[in-house]
Amino acid sequence: MNVFWFLPTHGDGHYLGTTKGARPVTLNYLKQVAQAADDLGYYGVLIPTGRSCEDSWVIASALVPLTERLKYLVAIRPGIISPTVSARMAATLDRLSGGRLLINVVTGGDPDENRGDGSFLDHSERYEVTDEFLHIWRRVLQGEAVDFEGKHLRVQNAKALYPPIQKPYPPLYFGGSSDAAHDLAADQVDVYLTWGEPPAAVAQKLADVRERAARKGRTVKFGIRLHVIVRQTSEEAWKAASTLIEHISDETIAAAQKSFSRFDSEGQRRMAALHDGRRDNLEIAPNLWAGVGLVRGGAGTALVGNPQEVAERIKEYADLGIESFIFSAYPHLEEAYRFAELVFPLLPEPYASLAGRGITNLTGPFGEMIANDLPPQAK
């Protein structure tokens, strides 16, 4: 099991949809989140991409030297950048990070944003471009001098003279819910990602990708992207979920859902269908809450509950074949600690041994001394 955290390069705070309780996302703040994740023993962090975010490659480059073990899941955007240039960027960051780069392949589901970035392709064309892009990208990073002429992309003698540390190349992660996405995942990527739909729906998606990959003689690993709201008791967790959205007006929800409706992303459509823009009945499966998706694009569901309940839901997804869990919570700095302290002890190794104390060569005692004389009692 690989447990990731998330860098909130598009904003952070205590509530959704309001400036109340918001905090500036400065480099120093992102450094705190990344170093907390590194110290606590998270496997890596996802850095989001898009016009609502700071640039993921610049952020990763700034944070790599400030962390020791943490891996960075950074987006590439086929159709926006040359596959050869993208491959060289990946090789350099992998080399400079000591092999800590992971690649998130993003086709882009917002036509308005895509046009702003210079891409006027429709849904099927974007997947055609992504397929051609990855054929070039993968071969370049394996040391080939690539000649390729496809429907959308053409290169001659494309090469990267400085190879990546990871072989054959930094692992490719990718998410999508359409047939075209499942075909691409089965053919070209290492880890297929899904957003946090109910387990039965996730099982169907994984089975479909698994079957398509088998027909191509490949195996694909799986991951899931979820928010999490964990507290000592279930009652506290559900109260925190309600508090997270208490400042969102109905007008803000309507505006957000109108914006999402222009997307041609099947995954975004499935996220929106879980709540239909309504505040009532947001628990769509045991301990799975769709409230985040009222105003947030992309991952819109959260695991909500006490540590045992959250760990049970994680195990439920793991039993389906999920190996990588990418979590986030508001605010991301405090919640990185809370999740590690409350849930890590209930997860498989190495997380159980970390127990929220993180990776350290200190043997204890941990906690404040009592009366300036006695060590704290072990629990």
From Swiss-Prot:
One example of the protein's molecular function in GO is: alkanesulfonate monooxygenase activity
What the protein does comes down to:
Catalyzes the desulfonation of aliphatic sulfonates.
Check the record and name the NCBIfam families matching this protein. alk_sulf_monoox, PRK00719.1
Q: What is its EC number?
A: 1.14.14.5
Q: Which GO terms describe its biological process?
A: alkanesulfonate catabolic process
Entry keyword Nucleotide-binding: no
Top enzyme category: oxidoreductase
Detail the disulphide connectivity of this chain as listed in its UniProt entry. Answer: none
Q: Which organism is it from?
A: Pseudomonas syringae pv. tomato (strain ATCC BAA-871 / DC3000)
Recorded catalytic reaction(s): these are: an alkanesulfonate + FMNH2 + O2 = an aldehyde + FMN + sulfite + H2O + 2 H(+)
Please identify the protein, giving its name as recorded. Alkanesulfonate monooxygenase
Family under the similarity heading: Belongs to the SsuD family.
What are the entry keywords?
Flavoprotein, FMN, Monooxygenase, Oxidoreductase
Is Oxidoreductase tagged as a keyword? yes
Q: Which domain of life is it from?
A: Bacteria
